[in-house]
Curated annotation (Swiss-Prot):
UniProt EC number: 1.-.-.-
Family from the record: Belongs to the zinc-containing alcohol dehydrogenase family.
Name of the featured protein: Trans-enoyl reductase prlC
Subunit structure: Monomer.
Gene name in the database record: prlC
Domain of life, per lineage: Eukaryota
Pfam families documented for this protein: ADH_N, ADH_zinc_N
Organism: Fungal sp. (strain NRRL 50135)
Residues bound to NADP(+): 50-53, 171-174, 194-197, 212, 259-260, 349-350
Keywords for this protein: NADP, Nucleotide-binding, Oxidoreductase
PANTHER family in the cross-refs: HYPOTHETICAL OXIDOREDUCTASE (EUROFUNG) (PTHR45348), TRANS-ENOYL REDUCTASE STHE (PTHR45348:SF1)
GO molecular function, one term: nucleotide binding
Length: 360
């Protein structure tokens, strides 16, 4: 145990309700520190599109939502020490919020329960607000780029050949994370976004930018890559995005990875392309209790990959080699989380990562 008052076992949190949505609760349970579980006093949280999409059958009444948080460890279970986590550590993580199997664990709470193996330590030079915006993006991109797409390089062991890799939706938070990781790994990021985001994505390392609204977008990418593009990461994942990615990939085919289930009808148009989609929580090594197609049993191999990749993210962060997406930081605590979700659903958020400060 740590400094958290033992008598206090309830807290304010954003939880699922009986209508398939979320609400602010002031009597949510505080997680218990046991085994490898630690309790973190949250200082900042970020709101991702996946949080906003958690509606309907994905909602468990009373379960705490949210994936990304940053804060200070206040309690530790007995097994936390083997992951070098102790009370007082500044940490951030991507966890599985709105989890029917661990309903008391979610980022959108005053005190967050998390498995110690999921935690990334925050360097002294990185703020809580910045740290809260890092883990979901960089963890998921690592899975997509270096496991699913099987890129022949790594940020700590760069490719000797600067192969082009398409990032569709480069102005998203996952997009700018992917661009940075590709550059570090020795690849050439070729990116789609709206023209008003060209300067943004080039500041993160994009080699070339293409307007996905342009009917000739795919043809322009094929020309840029000399009809030899072999890898595409789709950060948007809808029919249009997949069609452009498929049309941009070269004559020899290649690999396409999405961040949501992709349209099978588009996949059928070019069987020479290997399509896949990923979700970050598989790297936690836990059963996922969400409905199909997201629910699944724990995969030990993906957990091992996740632990290796988390160590890479920690090293890149310690060395100052990665940075967060541009932030829109809000005061007002957890009440702003629901506002941020609604803004994302209404497509009022562009080029910014929504971060909510929990302390003044």
């Amino acid at each position: 145990m740590g400094s958290l008052e033992k008598a206090r076992r309830t807290q304010t949190a954003v939880v699922g309700n009986n209508q398939g949505g979320v609400q602010l609760s002031h009597d949510a349970p505080i997680p218990e520190a046991k085994g490898d579980i630690v309790v973190v006093r949250a200082e900042a949280v970020s709101v991702n599109p996946v949080d906003a999409k958690m509606r309907g059958q994905y909602v468990t009444s009373g379960a705490i939502g949210g994936c990304d948080f940053a804060g200070v460890v206040v309690e530790v279970g007995l097994d936390a020490a083997k992951y070098d986590i102790k009370v007082g550590d500044r940490v951030c993580a991507a966890i599985m919020g709105m989890n029917p199997l661990e309903p008391a664990h979610g980022a959108f709470s005053e005190y967050v329960g998390a498995h110690a193996f999921a935690l990334v330590k925050i360097p002294p030079t990185v703020s809580f607000e910045s740290a809260a915006a890092l883990c979901t993006c960089f963890m998921t991109c690592g899975l997509a780029l270096f496991r699913s797409l099987q890129l022949p390089g790594h940020p700590l062991s760069p490719s000797s050949k600067p192969l082009p890799v398409l990032v569709y939706g480069g102005a998203t938070a996952t997009g700018t994370a992917a661009i940075q990781l590709l550059r570090l790994a020795g690849f050439t990021p070729v990116v789609t976004c709206s023209p008003h985001s060209y300067d943004l994505i080039k500041s993160y390392g994009a080699e070339a930018a293409f307007d996905y609204h342009d009917p000739d977008c795919a043809a322009q990418i094929r020309a840029q890559t000399k009809n030899g593009l072999r890898f595409a990461l789709d950060c948007i994942t809808n029919t249009q995005s997949m069609q452009i990615c498929y049309a941009a990939l070269g004559r020899a085919g290649g690999r396409y990875t999405a961040l949501d289930p992709y349209p099978e009808a588009v996949a059928a148009t070019r069987k020479i392309i290997k399509a896949d989609w990923v979700i970050g929580p598989v790297m936690l090594g836990l059963d996922i209790g969400w409905p199909a197609p997201h629910g699944r049993k724990a995969d030990p191999d993906l957990f091992e990959f996740g632990q290796r990749w988390k160590a890479t993210v920690q090293q890149l962060l310690n060395q100052g080699l990665i940075r967060e997406h541009p932030l829109f930081v809000q005061s007002g605590g957890l009440s702003r989380v629901i506002d941020s979700m609604e803004a994302i659903l209404a497509k009022k958020v562009s080029g910014k990562k929504m971060v909510c400060k929990l302390s003044q």
